[in-house]
Amino acid sequence: MPPKKVKEVGPPPGLDASLNSELSAAGCMNYVKLAEDFCDMDVICVPTGFPQLDYILHDKLRGCPRGRDVEIYSKEPELGKTTISLAFLKAFQKARLRTCYDDVERTMTLQYLKDLGMQIRPEENMEQYAIRLMRHEDSVIPAEVWLDTLIKLCGIMDLVVVDSVAALEKKANLEKKPGEPNQVGGLSLLLSEFYRKNVAKKATILWINQMRTKIGQYSPNGSVPLDTTGGKAIKFYSSIRLELSYVDKIRETKDGDPIGMKIKVFTSKNKVAPQFRQAIMSYIFGTGFSQHFDYMDAGLKNEIITKKGSWLSFGNWKAQGPLNFHNLMREDAELFKEIRIMVDGEDSVVAENVSQGTKPEDFEE
């Protein structure tokens, strides 16, 4: 006896109209089928110009995802949290995107921005892409007022850098008299409220955070556990969390003064690409993270640059030691260009990001 045919049951007629009607009555937006071209779900990345950093941010699209939250923190001070955030700003600015730097700590100087190669004075007809610097000179802005301003900025800007979360303070704590206790957990509640209000934002928010010891908590080995400021809201809402840690000093000679540091950038969280990846970046004092060092390290990993003993070579170029080869790359633009093309690759996804509004020369340091 032949098996009975199962009657296919499709969706009831008018299902989409009924759902839209019910959602509209409840004050919600219309739903969208996943089968349709839902472009808001696509991840669009902006290359930072540092191949190793781009890889750990997104191993396929290579760059910082737009419209997401990124948190940068470290256990120790002076490891380049602000400097690496300015590298993100520089990349977004070169990609013809609107950027804003919120100097909550009031420590940024114009000379430091110039030393890092930031474009202070925009080109003709490019005023909208100049970096906006937010700073309140007279007193500290209450966190309540600042977060309301940030919500408005997220609807205008493409990238907002907050430096830093630890400098934010509630109005009640600012107005309290000496000796009165602080309100515990007030900032974490405000940040949770901020994320609930800021559901329609399209800007990338880059949070710079610091770590503090947890009061009253101890681990079995006797050390005090550390945690970032501002509660757990940023921790959960961020798509990417970058932890910076010290690796080694960079010296011109064995007994010479340090000219920089090797910094490990570790993705402790990544919701758009595989997490728990790391990149060793070179931070040069006064000039920021070195793009030449990053391409040299990427070239060594991919065996584009040959290393025999202490000598590094690429084609007809040769130098003894990584620092000398780095200096050779800085002096010879043709060498750096060829290594950059080899590292990025002709078929790399970086080229696809270029077609979305940036130019190839924008990735040069």
Model-based region annotation:
Residues 53, 72, 113, 163, ...:
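Residue-level signature of catalytic and energy-coupling elements of molecular machines
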Residues 182-302:
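Phosphate-binding/switch region of NTP-binding enzymes
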Residues 310-365:
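Terminal-proximal interaction/regulatory segments of ATP-powered molecular machines
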Residues 61-65, 91-95, 118-124, 151-155, ...:
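Conserved catalytic network of the ASCE P-loop NTPase/AAA+ motor domain
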Residues 75, 87, 92-184, 189-193, ...:
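Conserved inter-motif catalytic segment of the P-loop NTP-binding fold
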Residues 173, 213-217, 308-311, 322-324:
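N-terminal cationic and glycine-rich segments that engage phosphates or anionic surfaces
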Residues 2-128:
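The Walker A/P-loop phosphate-binding site
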Residues 291-320:
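Long, well-ordered amphipathic alpha-helical subdomains in the mid-to-C-terminal portions
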